[in-house]
């Protein structure tokens, strides 16, 4: 994240599939080291991160010149790249939501395709698969960071965890401390999308957005996180984000596509101690005035106090229901770190105390 002057601050982010990982890495005006796997190690009192991959692999649906200009330009200009499950016509790739009219025939995942073609069950086959993908070199991106291949790594000042949550989590919050941050990351839930094989809209518990890739028991994994943080003199701050909060009456998203730029800029200021925050039951929240100034300066948007209240109100009953689900999800799991159970009980107590007070 590019801060004031020449200051550059590095963050790691973890999201389940189709929850904002690549779009966060591609925020306009900032740079990308990698969009997938990072290797973290404590070196010289800092947590250092290196990119262990040469490319970026993402969902291509809805990549268009308005919302994803850098990726779109990279995908539509000559270079080495890989497409999968797109529509091909006259040697050119097309995908859903690309911002232009699609051909009425071509080759796709069903073979020879034409408009109104149906599968064996009588369902209309779309021009391209909803989970179509692209693979490109990181170095081909205009916003590639100069340290993308730096073997010494970059210092991590913040770690961000986010999921797809339509009714509970605020857009951005800093956790109370490392221990609380590990607990919140372990409690991550996300609603399923077309990027998974599950039924869309189901809420899945996905600790650290990494459940499918764990090679050790979850209790050991959480303990590893806790111990890792204790060893770092310059401990990164842990943040939670949610780009998918909706108005429960209209069903419309409360966040714009580019709002994540503001959340990241606020985090950048936070880790450098340049903005204060409101201590809440679920972490430190931004002050309205700080966000208003960032929206005005970087997006030329008049960010209203009404929007702030809608986005950052603590939905206590929803949070309590969430942590009850987390309590049930971890019940019966042996050898959970004592710190995790302490944080869970304290989190529930803070929410109940707030309910009584407010």
For the regions a protein language model found, what residue spans apply to each?
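Catalytic or ion-translocation cores adjacent to nucleophile or general acid/base/metal-coordination motifs
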Residues: 3, 7-90
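Short, basic, glycine/proline-bearing loop/turn elements
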Residues: 2-11, 125-133
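Generic structural hydrophobic/aromatic packing signal, biased to beta-strands
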Residues: 1, 13, 22, 49-50, ...
């Amino acid at each position: 994240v590019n801060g004031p002057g020449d200051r550059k601050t590095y963050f790691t982010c973890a999201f389940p599939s189709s929850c904002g990982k690549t779009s966060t890495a591609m925020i306009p005006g900032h740079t990308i080291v990698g969009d997938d796997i990072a290797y973290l190690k404590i070196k010289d009192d800092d947590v250092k991160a290196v990119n262990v991959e040469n490319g970026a692999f993402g969902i291509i649906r809805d990549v268009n010149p308005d919302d994803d200009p850098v990726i779109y330009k990279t995908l539509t200009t000559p270079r080495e790249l890989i497409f999968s499950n797109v529509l091909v016509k006259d040697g050119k790739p097309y995908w859903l939501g690309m911002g232009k009219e699609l051909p009425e025939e071509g080759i796709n995942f069903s073979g020879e395709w034409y408009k109104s073609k149906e599968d064996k069950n009588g369902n209309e086959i779309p021009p391209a698969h909803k989970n179509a993908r692209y693979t490109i070199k990181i170095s081909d991106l205009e916003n590639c960071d100069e340290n993308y291949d730096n073997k010494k790594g970059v210092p991590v000042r913040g770690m961000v965890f986010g999921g797809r949550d339509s009714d509970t989590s605020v857009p951005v919050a800093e956790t109370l401390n490392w221990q609380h941050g590990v607990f919140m990351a372990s409690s991550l839930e996300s609603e399923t999308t077309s990027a998974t094989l599950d039924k869309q809209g189901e809420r899945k518990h996905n600790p650290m957005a990494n459940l499918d890739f764990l090679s050790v028991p979850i209790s050991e994994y959480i303990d590893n996180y806790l111990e890792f943080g204790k060893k770092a003199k310059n401990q990164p701050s842990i943040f939670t984000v949610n780009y998918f909060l909706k108005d429960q009456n209209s069903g419309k998203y409360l966040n714009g596509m580019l709002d994540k730029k503001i959340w990241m800029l606020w985090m950048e200021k936070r880790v450098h101690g340049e903005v204060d925050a409101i201590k809440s039951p679920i972490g430190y929240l931004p002050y309205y005035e700080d966000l208003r100034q960032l929206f005005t300066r970087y997006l030329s948007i008049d960010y209203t106090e009404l929007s702030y209240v809608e986005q950052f109100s603590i939905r206590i009953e929803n949070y309590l229901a969430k942590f009850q689900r987390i309590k049930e999800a971890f019940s019966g799991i042996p050898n959970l770190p004592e710190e995790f159970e302490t944080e869970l009980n304290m989190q529930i107590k803070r929410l109940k105390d707030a309910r009584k007070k407010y």
